A protein has these predicted regions:
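Metal-dependent phosphoester-hydrolase catalytic domains
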Residues: 14, 18, 28-36, 44-129
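Short, well-ordered alpha-helices that flank and scaffold nucleotide-derived cofactor binding pockets
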Residues: 25
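Active-site-proximal beta-strand elements of phosphoester/diester hydrolases
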Residues: 1-9
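Active-site flanking residues adjacent to catalytic metal/cofactor-binding acidic residues
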Residues: 6, 39-41
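Preference for well-ordered, secondary-structure-rich cores of eukaryotic proteins
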Residues: 21-22
Length: 129
């Protein structure tokens, strides 16, 4: 099983596309056929070219597999005070080896304070039989 965590460039769409192409090429050349989880801060909402490249590679967006939509409540980035600013830019993609059992974005804070400008997104996975 391969688990890769990434944090793509926050300024350039072209750089993000090249980064995700490099990740996919690395997986294909070194681990093709192995169960694969790719997650992290992709610095782009799901309407962009990075998302399309991941979907076209055959990886599955766990958010979509859970039946969730991208709407005003589905954001992972905020202004440190819990106010959404750019949407769902943190993703978890999986290969067909996995079943997504559960998941969500955690919006909780402690005394109105947040340890990051990203809300955690988690999924519970099981191997397909």
């Amino acid at each position: 099983m391969v688990v890769a965590v990434t944090h793509l460039d926050h300024r350039s769409t072209g750089a993000r596309v090249r980064q995700v192409e490099a990740i996919l090429r690395w997986y294909e050349q070194s681990y093709k056929g192995d169960p694969f989880i790719l997650l992290g801060d992709f610095n782009e909402p799901p309407e962009g070219p990075v998302y399309r490249a991941l979907v076209e590679s055959g990886l599955k967006d766990t958010w979509r597999l859970l039946g969730f939509e991208d709407d005003s409540q589905s954001y992972t980035h905020h202004d440190f005070e819990g106010q959404a600013d750019v949407g769902r830019i943190d993703w978890i993609f999986v290969s067909d080896h996995f079943q997504v059992l559960n998941g969500n974005i955690v919006l909780d804070s402690r005394d109105g304070r947040y340890p990051s400008d990203h809300f955690p997104y988690y999924v519970d996975l099981a191997f397909n039989r």
